[in-house]
Amino acid sequence: MLGGSATYFAASASHHTPVRAVGVIGSDYPRHRLDVLAKRDVDLSGVEQADGESFRWKGRYRHDLNVAETLETRLGVFASFRPKLPESFRDSEFVFLANIDPRLQLEVLDQVRRPTLAACDTMNFWIESRRDDVLAVIARVDLVTLNDGEARQLTGLANLVQAARWLLDHGPRHVIIKKGEHGAFMFTRESVFFAPAYPLEKLFDPTGAGDSFAGGFMGWIARTGDLSEGNLRRAVVYGSAMGSFAVEGFSIDRLIEIGPDDISRRVTEFRELVSFDRELPA
């Protein structure tokens, strides 16, 4: 099954903007499986194929689908991967450092020239094993996105508002804390914004929802080039919309099936979810 942070991110973001992907796959990975992304204006010239096994993550969800239990992480070719950005990638204005070894995230940052907005994600595996490197990445980006459990784990603070303030004190201007089916918060030093999750009766697989959220968020920002507070809030809603599509199917199936009209309708439905100043039927 096609997976990986970059895969979900690219499938989501490509609905809004061309994407340049950087990563590595093993010799066991049929490269033609990536054709579905290439057809969506995703430049794969930064994806290397190396001898060895592809990265693999194994996990399970119990009653609470907001929490993934990691059963196994096999780095494979990622263990020796050193990202080398094509020269044509180095002028990228909007950079998202997906969930990989934070040392590799730092290497990517060292190769891009002057990004307008750099954002990063991480996970419990890296927080446990390379916390100092995770903090080094956070100190260099404009925005960090992570889920509520990761925010608590990284900061040692149970209160999410306090955790967000702690993260803001360590470098980024914006912190997004995702709470799965309960929505997402965006914090700055001056403001707090909340977007609900889309209410779904049927959910197939929550894997990749966070990366799809990031793709929707960064894709919208790259499309508009607008870093105003209002547009960042709209980007959170677009991220939530894309995440809601991702969980409606397995792998990136739904992200490939949908079109602009589907996205517009869902964003409108998000607006209706939080509208309280219009007249309602008696």
Enumerate the predicted regions with their spans:
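Short catalytic helix/loop segments, enriched in acidic residues and glycine
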Residues: 1-11
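Short, conserved phosphate/pyrophosphate- and ester-handling motifs at nucleotide-, phospho-/glycolipid
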Residues: 13, 147, 210
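Conserved phosphate/ATP/ADP-binding segment of small-molecule kinases
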Residues: 114-117, 124-194
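Conserved phosphate-binding/catalytic region of the ribokinase-like
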Residues: 160-282
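Alpha-helix C-terminal capping segments
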Residues: 9-19, 220-222
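Conserved N-terminal subdomain of the carbohydrate kinase-like
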Residues: 15-97, 109-115, 264-282
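A short acidic, amphipathic alpha-helical/loop segment
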Residues: 33, 104-111, 132-136
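Short beta-strand scaffold segments in enzyme catalytic cores
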Residues: 11, 57-60, 183-187
